[in-house]
Amino acid sequence: MAGSLLASHLAMAHPHGWIDMSVRVITDDNGVATGLHQTWRMDPFYSLVVFEELQQVPGGSMEEGLDQLGGEIRDNLAAQHYFTEVRIGSEKQSFGDVTEYTALERGGRLTFMFILPLASPQPLSGQVLEYQVFDPTYYIEMVHEEEGDEPSPQALILNGEPECALSVLPADPDPELVMQAALLDTDEEGEPGLGRHFAETGRVDCR
């Protein structure tokens, strides 16, 4: 039941919930990027709804329900490229299958953690890696973890060798798109790709 709720939550349009996220770019000892470790914290209201549904499953524990939910989230996201786009230089990167993931309760929030592997590991030396994580329909707003009004130092981390400049760039959507999104009801879908215009950009500059 919680899985179907999540599927519908992910399939609709414009910002009626949000996810606080943090990203760790994984590199090997040679400074080659191998993937992105992402942590998503669902908003408190949605988390409460999911936890209440899991508690109502007869004969099941919360831990078992979360294990099943993690697999359902992974499967739903796989069909949508995990809401993630990555570029290194001018080249858009493809992804491998997500096999490492978990769903858990942390501080009252439903938290989903997973490693998104690059299909082909890429050296970062002399390169700029940029990523965006967004719901294409903008039903869910994806934002990096914040401290005050600024991205948290833990919102983007580089794990591994190269010394690179890390930054999270804010979205700068056209005012007409902001109005378009605000006028959508919960049962209406936005234009395909609407969420891209509201996406923050994580940048790892190793030049």
Language-model features: locations:
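N-terminal signal peptide c-region/cleavage motif recognized by signal peptidases
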Residues: 8-10
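Residues that act as N-cap/strand-start positions at coil-to-secondary-structure junctions
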Residues: 17-19, 80, 125, 198
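Sec-dependent signal peptide recognition
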Residues: 1-4
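Mature, soluble, non-transmembrane domains
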Residues: 89-207
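Structured domain cores in non-transmembrane regions
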Residues: 45-124
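Early extracytoplasmic/domain-onset interaction patches
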Residues: 15-48
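Sequence-level motif detector for i,i+2 pairs with an aromatic at +2
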Residues: 33, 81, 199-201
